[in-house]
């Protein structure tokens, strides 16, 4: 019996898929990494084969490739489907990504309640982004009953895993007394740790704190680091803080900004 052109193409694709699966099983870790960091379109073929075979990590990666249009045509709906499959397979990062799809309306109608469910599953599995994102929904009361104290607890859990953004928000809670008693010492500690992790908003916040404590030199250093991120909002915020500053280091930084230097320094 002869095959139609369509049947022949499907048979050839299936055979190629099977061959890729066999080769994947024989690859060393180094060979696999070289494959995944090579040509995106070629990598997508291998990732799809592993995803269709049922490997949650591959399903997650394929979802990301589809969401970003990396090596494949961008398809938010297909990305969400693969995130869901990986999440159902127990992958905490995929649970978080499925939550992001629900929260942002990527490939699926926006639904904060479903986002919270996925974030909670991810958070309870110990994923830092799941903890952070669940904290945000709890803080704002989106999809869940607002609970700022619970939000802070999740921020702290993510912070202890090294999540820079969570550290910054935990610091803000301690600074303002949101969901906890005010604690300048805790706020300073978490702003510092977040700033040292490289998060530019925390670098600005820590700089403000240091300026208020009278350490203009250290404040100027952190402001300069924050400015290096190139965020217009932070640049405007730094400029406002520097208005009327008398400390020599802060005055010099203000002059650098006025001269158009991106980080305020030479």
Predicted regions and their residues:
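Short helix-capping/linker turns of helical repeat alpha-solenoids
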Residues: 24, 39, 52-55, 68-70, ...
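Ankyrin-repeat and related helical/solenoid repeat scaffolds used for protein-protein interactions
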Residues: 161-237
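Terminal, low-structured helical/coil segments at or just beyond the last alpha-helical repeat
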Residues: 5-6, 227-266
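Long, contiguous interaction/recruitment modules in multidomain scaffold/adaptor proteins
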Residues: 1-21
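Hydrophobic face of amphipathic alpha-helices that form TPR/SEL1-like repeat modules
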Residues: 28-35, 61-68, 95, 99-104, ...
């Amino acid at each position: 019996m002869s095959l139609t052109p369509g049947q022949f193409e499907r048979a050839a694709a299936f055979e190629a898929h099977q061959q890729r699966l066999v080769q994947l099983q024989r690859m060393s870790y180094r060979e696999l990494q070289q494959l995944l960091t090579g040509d995106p379109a070629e990598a997508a073929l291998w990732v799809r084969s592993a995803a269709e075979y049922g490997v949650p990590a591959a399903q997650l990666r394929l979802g990301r490739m589809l969401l970003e249009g990396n090596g494949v045509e961008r398809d938010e709906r297909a990305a969400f489907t693969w995130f869901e499959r990986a999440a159902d397979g127990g992958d905490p990062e995929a649970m978080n990504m499925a939550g992001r799809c629900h929260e942002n309306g990527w490939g699926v109608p926006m639904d904060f309640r479903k986002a919270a469910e996925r974030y909670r599953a991810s958070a309870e599995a110990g994923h830092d982004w799941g903890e952070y994102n669940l904290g945000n929904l709890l803080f704002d009361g989106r999809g869940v009953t607002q609970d700022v104290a619970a939000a802070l607890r999740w921020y702290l859990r993510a912070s202890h895993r090294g999540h820079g953004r969570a550290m910054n928000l935990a610091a803000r809670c301690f600074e303002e007394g949101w969901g906890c008693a005010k604690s300048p010492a805790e706020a300073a500690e978490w702003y510092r740790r977040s700033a040292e992790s490289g998060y530019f908003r925390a670098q600005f916040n820590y700089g403000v704190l240091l300026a208020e404590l009278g350490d203009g030199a250290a404040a100027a250093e952190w402001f300069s680091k924050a400015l290096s991120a190139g965020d217009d909002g932070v640049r405007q915020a730094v400029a406002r803080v520097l208005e009327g500053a008398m400390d020599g280091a802060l005055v010099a930084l203000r002059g650098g900004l006025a001269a158009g230097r991106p980080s305020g320094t030479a």
